[in-house]
């Protein structure tokens, strides 16, 4: 299955191969140089590469790791109490790394009781296991858990945006060439700018649309744009009839993406 899904097939396996600002990349290279992985909280927008970096760090250090998705509310608590606890409490015989690693993806989707349980696990298994949490909104992580982690924010600012977008554009061209998919370069640029820095969404959209054999302007009409400024303007003016129209017209968009766009516009 991973050979079919582009996001998995072309997922970077090393920190060097990850598309990130140099300042962020240096942080993880320093961890590689010391051979140590601290408990970490990786915060930033969806699709920017938080989980990819966590996996790449483990791969390069040869650390055994176990991934749990915090969005799986139904089974998450049982998975943490059983599978994760068993993983964290045993010593790896096949790895030379100092610690095992548990990656909690989308940790901001977990409840307070789960986060307090994870805090207890950090202390209980400190000698054998490290925890890496990823989140879109770090303010949703409780202070007792937050304070036990080194926080790395995946923020891309100012001039870095153009540089990082250009690197992803080249990576996207490479992937499309490998997959033998024709593409209009101007369309790719517009697509990247539209969803920056959500690389996962760009790649998923390209793969979905590539079934026709070519990526052209049609992909830009395949999903609706989100005019967040219109929403904020109407809210400030208390024009609630227009707000309702905006909500209805954006029902098909992902909730997390909408919230992120609004959050970024406010801050």
What kind of region is each of these model predictions?
Residues 1-160, 167, 207:
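P-loop/Walker A NTP-binding region and its immediately flanking N-terminal helices
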Residues 166-267:
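AAA+ P-loop NTPase domains with strong preference for DNA replication initiators
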């Amino acid at each position: 299955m991973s050979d079919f899904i582009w996001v998995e097939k072309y997922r970077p396996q090393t920190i060097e191969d990850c598309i990130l600002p140099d300042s962020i990349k240096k942080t993880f290279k320093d961890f590689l140089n010391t051979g140590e992985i601290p408990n970490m909280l990786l915060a930033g927008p969806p699709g920017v590469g938080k989980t990819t970096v966590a996996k790449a760090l483990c791969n390069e250090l040869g650390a055994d790791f176990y991934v749990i998705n915090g969005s799986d509310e139904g089974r998450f608590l049982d998975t943490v109490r059983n599978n994760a606890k068993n993983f964290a409490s045993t010593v790896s015989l096949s790895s030379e790394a100092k610690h095992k690693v548990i990656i909690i993806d989308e940790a901001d989707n977990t409840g307070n009781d789960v986060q307090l349980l994870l805090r207890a696990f950090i202390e209980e298994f400190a000698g054998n296991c490290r925890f890496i949490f990823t989140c879109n909104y770090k303010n949703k992580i409780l202070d007792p858990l937050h304070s036990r982690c080194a926080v790395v924010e995946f923020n891309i600012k100012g001039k870095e945006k153009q540089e990082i977008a250009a690197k992803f554009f080249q990576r996207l061209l490479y992937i499309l060439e490998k997959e033998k998919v024709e593409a209009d370069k101007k369309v790719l640029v517009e697509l990247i700018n539209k969803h920056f820095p959500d690389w996962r969404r760009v790649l998923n959209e390209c793969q979905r649309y590539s079934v026709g054999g070519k990526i052209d302007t049609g992909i830009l009409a395949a999903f609706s744009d989100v005019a967040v400024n219109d929403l904020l303007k109407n809210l400030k003016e208390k024009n609630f009839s227009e707000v309702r129209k905006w909500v209805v017209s954006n029902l098909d968009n992902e909730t997390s993406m909408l919230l992120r766009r609004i959050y970024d516009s406010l801050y």
